[in-house]
Amino acid sequence: MSDGTVAAVRGVSFEIPEGAFLTLLGPSGCGKTTTLRCVAGLEAPDSGEIHIGERLVFSGSQGVAVPAYKRGVGMVFQSYAIWPHMTVFENVAFPLVHGGFRVPRSQVKERVRKALELIGLAELGSRPAPLLSGGQQQRVSLARALVYEPRLLLLDEPLSNLDAKLREEMRLELRELIDRLKISTLYVTHDQEEALVLSDRIAVMRDGQILQEGSPREIYLDPLNPFVASFVGKANFVDGSVEGQKDERGGIAIRTPLGQLICAPRLDLTIGEQVSVVFRPEDVHVRTDSSGHDRNTFPGVVERVIFVGNKILCEIRVGSVLVQSEINARFKLQQGGKVTVEISPECIGVIRHKQ
């Protein structure tokens, strides 16, 4: 999809299995919301095809463009779009009375009652919308999207307007609800933790393209390129070159400014190949003594210590490299203190420079 000068979405392709939860994750302007709006029928792509189930709802080559109200999708917007002049019941009932999925009036009350029960607001049907809290408005918006039993649920950053604590609670409630309903879901967010908690699959986007798609575990532990590694969580990067096999356990030796690092990559690497090694701050073990294994163990000096409640964020100078680490909040470190840093080979990823 393009505005004539810049392609907002390029070559994006994905499939959501029935009942699965797929998240489009990326920074602002990466094309994730545009992609969702194309699926919803609120934007028209320049080319390609979109299928919802077995139904073709868009095809550039065949001239098919099913309007949004006929696609059978439920959508929750970032702003919730709750009508202030209506009650909770009237907001949820709207698509059954005025939308493209009208049902006999005799069925409206029961459908709305079930939808409100699903989201825990069965007692608030008569309440005016302006009297709802932010969390309640989010639930009403979700009930309205589910009341006509759509085949696909689309959610565009629905939790971003909530405070941090309520957002965490709503993540779990939303995932539990989706599991109960077994409804296919496409979710858009820039929040990495939100994507990891909610999703069966994550597609990381940048500049209108999907850079990597996989399970939350794959995306976090096995990033394919530096952008995915740094955008999804924090990461340490160190450039190096492959030296060869190191030991009988299949570890690969990589020469880096830290020294020789032994890695357990899932890639076939050649001697002399230029790579970047990547490891997470929580996988950097810090000790105040010099004991430990000789593999991937280096002396360092603490340059910065930040207490954040449940953990300590610290920066440790190892040679010419500044290594980030996250450690238990009860572990005592002082700026300028000498420490030993150890990184397990199994916790080190390898990214080819050509990627």
Which positions does each model-derived feature cover?
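The feature captures the beta-strand-to-loop junction immediately N-terminal to the Walker
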Residues: L25-P27
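ABC ATPase nucleotide-binding domains
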Residues: G72-G74, Q78, I82-S230
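Conserved coupling/switch loops of ABC nucleotide-binding domains, chiefly the family-specific signature
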Residues: D46-E49, D207, D239
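Conserved ABC transporter NBD signature motif
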Residues: G48-G60
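Helix-to-loop junction immediately C-terminal to a conserved catalytic motif
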Residues: A40
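Glycine/charge-rich catalytic "coupling/switch" loops of P-loop NTPases
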Residues: L221, A253-E303, R330-Q355
